[in-house]
């Protein structure tokens, strides 16, 4: 079994700023993101939510089978974060900075442009997938949908896979890309998102990708320690 690059059992708070452990500070983003998102979802004062819809939404049928890739998203993102955290710290840093940049942009968008969707159908039937979708609808509100974090997170994983030597073979790349596309499609076939939300998520990814993964060598001095760019952090 492949051993982790760093023995995290040696971590002490006093060593947080050492080169060995300073990437752990990037994990602080997750509680901050969760708190802000929770506030926007549940505690912000009542505001007008702009409905996101386009003509194409009404041509896309609801398909309960897409709840499978939709739910797999959590394992997809969490699994890649865990893998890079254990076995490829530079890739972990770049993936986290990509997430920090794109997710933060999404939060600012939700704050300044509150949005929602009214595309969910009435669910009929008592089979497992329908019941699971009903639970998903109950747990996840229909607000703060554009840009889609499901789409952004999916392509964060794909870009991270491209960044790791062992996943650069065409078979691996195609597998990760296929899953990212399936998850993105699941958001519209489950009526969790409008096509507009997906397109906005893809646009955010396209804008962020060169900032994280294609930083010019001459700009490396402007990048924060533990921060962005392949030139700054050669692969282990």
Identify what each model region corresponds to.
Residues 168-181:
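Short hydrophobic alpha-helices at membrane interfaces in multi-pass membrane enzymes
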Residues 121-123, 142-146, 182-210:
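Interfacial helix-loop-helix junctions of multi-pass membrane proteins
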Residues 41-57, 85-171, 212, 219-236:
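Membrane-interface loops
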Residues 34-36, 103-111, 178-188:
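Aromatic-anchored segments of alpha-helical transmembrane domains
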Residues 22-26, 30, 67, 94-95, ...:
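Residue-level signature of transmembrane alpha-helical entry/exit and packing/kink sites
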Residues 76-81, 154-160, 178-186:
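Hydrophobic, membrane-inserted alpha-helices
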Residues 67-82, 100, 104, 153:
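Hydrophobic alpha-helical transmembrane segments
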């Amino acid at each position: 079994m492949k051993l982790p690059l760093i023995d995290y059992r040696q971590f002490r708070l006093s060593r947080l700023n050492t080169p060995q452990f300073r990437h752990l500070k990037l994990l602080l983003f997750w509680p901050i993101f969760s708190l802000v998102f929770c506030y926007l979802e549940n505690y912000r004062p009542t505001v007008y939510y702009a409905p996101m819809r386009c003509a194409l939404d009404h041509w896309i049928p609801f398909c309960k089978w897409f709840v499978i890739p939709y739910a797999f998203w959590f394992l997809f993102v969490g699994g890649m974060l865990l893998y890079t955290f254990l076995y490829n710290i530079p890739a972990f840093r770049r993936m986290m900075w990509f997430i920090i940049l794109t997710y933060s942009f999404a939060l600012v968008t939700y704050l300044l442009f509150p949005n929602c969707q009214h595309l969910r159908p009435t669910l009929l039937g008592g089979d497992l997938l329908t019941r699971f979708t009903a639970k998903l609808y109950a747990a996840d509100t229909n607000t703060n949908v554009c840009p889609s974090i499901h789409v952004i997170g999916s392509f964060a994983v794909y870009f991270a896979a491209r960044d790791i030597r062992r996943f650069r073979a065409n078979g691996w790349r195609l597998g990760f890309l296929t899953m990212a596309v399936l998850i993105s499609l699941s958001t519209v076939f489950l009526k969790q998102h409008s096509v507009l939300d997906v397109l906005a998520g893809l646009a955010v990814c396209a804008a962020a990708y060169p900032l994280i993964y294609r930083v010019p060598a001459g700009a490396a001095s402007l990048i924060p320690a533990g921060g962005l760019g392949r030139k700054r952090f050669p692969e282990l």
